[in-house]
């Protein structure tokens, strides 16, 4: 499954590799990879494969889940697809509380005393995932873990999740993506070393 998802992300250009002309992330980090999983929403076959893959992860690792929770904004549609097929309640978590109305950070199903799985699109350092987890826990939820489409495989993410005592699972990862890109002739051996060095240095 990891290989198929990686290939799909590359084919629809939800993930782009550019070892010799770096992208600039919003954080300012210069990177040979750019990931925008929102593009998957425009490809029903891909988004359905993602939905079914994430459901498989949830059933395998978090079978006692009661609520599916999406991270705003990119995790929301995938959480919706999952909750619909699993026939489970859903909510979503903002990065911070609204400044008006009831100032809610969590919208949708009530999480108190419920087993919740958080759905992310992408894990880089894990910071946004854990922000959502902490908001849910403050609301009384029992967060079982996090599932996501893709991870860069940074050591920082492992540290972040381990510190919070929250497990996470992804459909595909950076290593798989590099392997697929190599097999498809999209990158050279020199490119592979550049990509590996970038990730290792960032970790």
From Swiss-Prot:
Keyword tags: Glycosyltransferase, Magnesium, Pyrimidine biosynthesis, Transferase
GO-annotated molecular function: magnesium ion binding; orotate phosphoribosyltransferase activity
Can you supply a Gene Ontology BP term from the record?
'de novo' UMP biosynthetic process
Q: Which reaction does it catalyse?
A: orotidine 5'-phosphate + diphosphate = orotate + 5-phospho-alpha-D-ribose 1-diphosphate
- EC number(s) of the enzyme? 2.4.2.10
**Positions that bind orotate:** 124
Binding residues annotated for 5-phospho-alpha-D-ribose 1-diphosphate, in chain numbering: 94, 98, 100, 120-128
From the UniProt record, give the pathway where this protein acts: Pyrimidine metabolism; UMP biosynthesis via de novo pathway; UMP from orotate: step 1/2
Q: Which Pfam families match?
A: Pribosyltran (PF00156)
Cited InterPro entries: OPRT (IPR023031), Or_phspho_trans_dom (IPR004467), PRibTrfase_dom (IPR000836), PRTase-like (IPR029057)
Q: Which cofactor does it need?
A: Mg(2+)
Q: Which family does it belong to?
A: Belongs to the purine/pyrimidine phosphoribosyltransferase family. PyrE subfamily.
Under the heading HAMAP family, the entry gives:
PyrE
Indicate the quaternary assembly: Homodimer.
Q: Which PANTHER family match?
A: OROTATE PHOSPHORIBOSYLTRANSFERASE (PTHR19278), URIDINE 5'-MONOPHOSPHATE SYNTHASE (PTHR19278:SF9)
Q: What does this protein do?
A: Catalyzes the transfer of a ribosyl phosphate group from 5-phosphoribose 1-diphosphate to orotate, leading to the formation of orotidine monophosphate (OMP).
- The protein here is known as Orotate phosphoribosyltransferase
Species the sequence originates in: Staphylococcus epidermidis (strain ATCC 35984 / DSM 28319 / BCRC 17069 / CCUG 31568 / BM 3577 / RP62A)
């Amino acid at each position: 499954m990891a290989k198929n998802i990686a290939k799909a992300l590359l084919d629809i250009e939800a993930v782009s590799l550019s070892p010799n002309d770096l992208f600039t992330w919003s954080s300012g980090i210069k990177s040979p990879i750019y990931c925008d999983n929102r593009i998957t929403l425009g490809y029903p076959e891909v988004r359905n494969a993602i939905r079914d893959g994430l459901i498989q992860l949830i059933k395998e690792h978090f079978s006692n889940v009661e609520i599916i929770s999406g991270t705003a904004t990119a995790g929301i549609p995938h959480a919706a697809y999952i909750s619909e097929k699993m026939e489970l309640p859903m909510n979503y978590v903002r990065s911070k509380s609204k400044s008006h109305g009831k100032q809610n950070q969590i919208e949708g199903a009530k999480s108190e005393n419920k087993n919740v799985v958080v759905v992310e699109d992408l894990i880089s350092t894990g910071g946004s995932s854990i922000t959502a987890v902490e908001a849910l826990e403050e609301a009384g939820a029992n967060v079982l873990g996090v599932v996501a489409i893709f991870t860069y495989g940074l050591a920082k993410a492992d540290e972040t999740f381990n510190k919070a005592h929250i497990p996470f699972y992804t459909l595909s990862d950076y290593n798989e993506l590099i392997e697929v890109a190599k097999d498809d002739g999209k990158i050279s051996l020199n490119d592979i070393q550049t990509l590996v060095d970038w990730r290792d240095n960032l970790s």
